[in-house]
Design a protein with these regions (language model features):
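Low-complexity, highly charged intrinsically disordered N-terminal segments
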Residues: 26-104
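Conserved, well-structured core domains of diverse proteins
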Residues: 1-58, 561, 569, 580-583, ...
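Charged (often Lys/Glu-rich) extended helix/loop segments that serve as interaction or gating elements
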Residues: 314, 320-639
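Short, glycine-/Ser/Thr-/acidic-enriched flexible segments
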Residues: 30, 38, 68, 103-105, ...
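Active-site-proximal beta-alpha core segment in soluble small-molecule metabolic enzymes
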Residues: 88-284, 291, 295, 305-310, ...
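Flexible glycine/acidic-rich beta-alpha junction loops that bind and position SAM and/or redox cofactors
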Residues: 203-207, 281-300, 334-349
Length: 639
């Protein structure tokens, strides 16, 4: 086993880049989480998984750190308060709200609500169910409740009645047709909510969520529609309730310039409306604060070229600049950051089940006399491969392989000869890989292609569609790495496959110091020794979007907190994952009925003499017992 220096291990998995002070590699070669930030005590994930295993919690296992949620709430609110102070802005409040859709789990929202009480940190909802959930939270009454999304009469009525629970409820007009229900409702209620208008800005962000902004956005009012809404509210006598402008140009906005551009455009509209007599008090800059998943600090789609502090400072500075130019007071600032608040708190731990290698065999003989020219050319390419001709030889080998496949398809090459050709091709790739590695040419396109062609597959005990749906849905990349053996130099590269019966259930792109790569570095699997991988920063959207493909259900879950004084960690909450019976019931099978049907079928087999009494008893126990087991595979037995 080759030793790997700590600095090289950090570079290999780029932990200092994406960890943001919450993750680090220990001197013992394990991955640790620091729930209180870089200066607080740490939780060794490998130790934690072993302890939790003894308590009956197995992999796949979701670990949650509520103190990270608290730390992120403090950091976000503190950043805006500091930005207001640094810009000399007085009598203006920052009024952050958490969009429940980003993570709707009760314990997550409760933790955020409790942490936000001192900041009057509020909630944003987009459905009737989310509204009810928000109203049950123990929050500061002065915190805002922002109601977005499409709304019918019942939803609008419930939002209006929410003013009994909150001092300020803001109902946002997401499309102009909502006025038809809203104006009569305002006429009939005593406790009237504040109103907001979502703008359809010209500004937009590139990338996966580009259609959230711009003129073709799903939500929002155009300028003519805004003016129409203002006039309609004026004529109805409710213009005093229009107190907020809102915009949202997308999630994971990696380039700060896109944010400042949108803020300037929206603030200009705000100022013009104020001059027209609209009593606006708030500007809601939406969400979009990005998470630096790959740690590059760039404007790439999986990164962010700014910190939370720079995000807040840029927004406040742009607001002040435009308002000062227009002679309009700076409004209170609302933002709806969700991803940036909850991503870091959750880690999915999975165990490797097995490796599926691509065999690279040495050719044991030269081609036959009657073999085609392309096979002989491939053989000579292999024989005379050197550092001087490595790139040319690689491309030649790829072409010869294609030629030979065409000959086989046309019936001019035997299966045996095609097998020898494939063995020769893979042996050539192996030599190319070794030469490029020795020559430090690993950042080339050719090396990436070779690594991909020769990569192994590590099958892991999880469902991509349940736990990391954004990898499949929007090609999101998350930091993934082993949680132990990090001071051992990994000898292999691999992709990661889940246990669903779906070819899309595979992770084929991984973060890298220079961007992304088609494989990740992995160690050999030792017989009888579990090999654990961490899939980090999975706290945003994955819980809400995960589905039950192949009827794989929720994972086991553990909530962990650290004691700042003692430095130790404690399991504060845990839950077992879905059972087979849970998932069958979810698709409308009755577990009791299924068990009875199994008993009937077994009895029929026994009565007909197909099985004896002992086998009948064993079959019944097997299948009824299986229904109470986990939907995932048995505890780790890495081989």
């Amino acid at each position: 086993m080759a030793h790997l220096p700590l600095r090289e291990a950090e570079d290999l998995y780029h932990v200092p880049g994406w960890g943001d002070g919450y993750y680090r590699i220990t001197g013992q070669g394990t991955l640790a989480v620091l729930p209180l930030g870089p200066n607080g005590p740490e939780v060794d994930l490998h130790d934690a998984v072993q302890v939790l295993s003894e308590q009956g919690l197995g992999t796949p296992l979701t670990l949650r750190f509520p103190q990270i949620l608290e730390h992120r709430v403090d950091r976000l609110n503190g950043a805006f308060h500091k930005a207001l102070k640094d810009n000399g802005i007085k009598d203006v409040r920052y009024r952050g709200v958490f969009p429940i859709k980003v993570n709707q789990r009760k314990e997550v929202v409760q933790t955020l609500a409790k942490a936000g009480r001192k900041w009057s940190y509020g909630l944003e909802v987009g459905s009737k169910a989310e509204l009810i959930a928000a109203l049950t939270m123990d929050q500061n009454r002065k915190s805002l409740l922002v109601v977005n999304g499409f709304k019918d009469k019942a939803f609008l009525e419930a939002a209006c009645e929410a003013t009994h629970f909150k001092d300020t409820v803001v109902i946002v007009l997401d499309e102009v047709g909502e006025l038809e229900h809203l104006i009569p409702l305002l006429d009939s209620v005593d406790r009237k909510p504040a109103l907001g208008i979502r703008l359809k800005l010209r500004s937009k962000a590139p990338g996966k969520w580009a259609l959230s902004g711009g003129e073709r956005a799903k939500f929002g009012l155009t300028i003519p529609e805004v003016l129409y809404a203002v006039e309609a509210l004026r004529q109805a006598g409710h213009l005093d309730r229009l107190q907020m402008l809102h915009f949202h140009i997308g999630s994971q906005i990696s380039d700060i310039r896109r944010i400042t551009q949108a803020v300037r455009e929206a603030t200009r509209i705000h100022c013009e409306l104020v001059k027209m007599g609209v009593p606006l008090r708030y500007i809601d800059v939406g969400g979009g604060a990005a998470v630096d998943y790959d740690g590059s600090g760039s404007s790439g789609s999986n990164s962010a070229n700014y910190t939370l502090e720079e995000y807040a400072s840029s927004i406040v500075a742009q607001l002040k600049d435009v308002c000062d130019e227009s002679g309009v007071p700076v409004p209170d600032i609302i933002n709806e950051s969700g991803r940036a608040v909850v991503s870091h708190h959750a880690v999915l731990i999975v165990n490797a089940i097995r490796k599926v290698p691509h065999l690279v065999l040495s050719p044991d003989e030269e081609p036959h006399d009657d073999d085609p020219t392309s096979l002989w050319n491939l053989y000579y390419t292999y024989q005379y491969l050197s550092p001087k001709n490595v790139f040319e030889s690689f491309h030649d080998a790829v072409q010869y392989r294609e030629d030979l496949q065409s000959l086989f398809d046309l019936g001019h090459l035997s299966l045996e000869a095609l097998g020898r050709a494939e063995t020769l091709f893979r042996a050539t790739l192996g030599k190319v890989r070794d030469i490029l590695a020795e020559e430090e040419e690993t950042d080339t396109e050719e090396f990436e292609q070779v690594a991909s062609l020769l990569s192994q597959k590590v099958v892991c005990n999880f469902s991509l569609f349940q736990s990391l749906p954004d990898v499949w849905g929007v090609k999101q990349q998350f930091p993934i790495m082993p949680i132990h053996r990090l001071r051992e130099r990994p000898e292999d590269t691999a992709t990661l496959a889940d246990i669903t019966c779906d070819s899309d259930g595979e992770i084929r792109r991984f973060i890298d110091l220079e961007g992304t790569k088609p494989t990740m570095a992995t160690h050999d699997l030792r017989k009888g020794e579990p090999y654990y991988l961490a899939m980090c920063l999975v706290g945003a959207y994955q819980d809400s979007l995960g589905d039950y493909h192949n009827l794989f259900g929720e994972t086991d879950e553990a909530w962990i907190e650290v004691d700042p004084a003692r430095g130790n960690w404690t399991l504060t909450r845990s839950s077992s994952g879905s059972r087979v019976s849970d998932m069958l019931e979810w698709v409308r099978y009755s577990p009791a009925d299924l068990k009875e049907r199994i008993r009937e079928r077994v009895k029929r087999l026994k009565d007909r003499g197909h099985i004896d009494a002992e086998t009948a008893k064993s079959l019944t126990a097997r299948y009824t017992g299986l229904m109470e087991s986990s939907t995932y595979l048995e505890p780790p037995r890495a081989t």
